Amino acid sequence: LITEYLARVGGPPVFLAMPRVNFNALEREVAYIAKMEELGLEPTIIGVDALNTEGHFEAHGLAVLDRYFSKGDFINSSILCANDRVAIGALRAAAHHGLEPGSLRRGGLRIAGHDDYPLSQFMIPTLTTVAQNVEAIGQAAVDRLIEKLRVEKFQANQTVQLMDGVLKVRDSA
């Protein structure tokens, strides 16, 4: 959803990976690669060499992009961050280098994230993101619980059910 949007409005997005502290860290990277290949675009992933297990997402986004922006790399790119907290660090790195990400500019830097973190709509610029469909997730959880209560010998296998997100286009991309 967001990979396709960024490719359409600002060029092939670069994926800024996040620390591997939960299962979706790698899943989002894999989904990005699959979508880029589907679009016939070359995936570019950054930040993998700086990954830690501490979960300092904002510091990670800041450190990785500060290093690239210092060399003049990715200053006119669309950057898709693995989550909104990484994107907050990315926005900070952009500010440190006098860069102004934004959807209202032609070309230039665009930064987006995932999760619709509560502060995303209050950042400057406001952060373009994908919100999780909490209502659908909740309904699926209730349905699964009801199924478990109704069935005498419920199979407790782990299942993964993907839900469509909701694109929140804001000022950053």
For each of these PLM feature ranges, what is it?
Residues 1-173:
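Bacterial carbohydrate/catabolite-sensing allosteric modules
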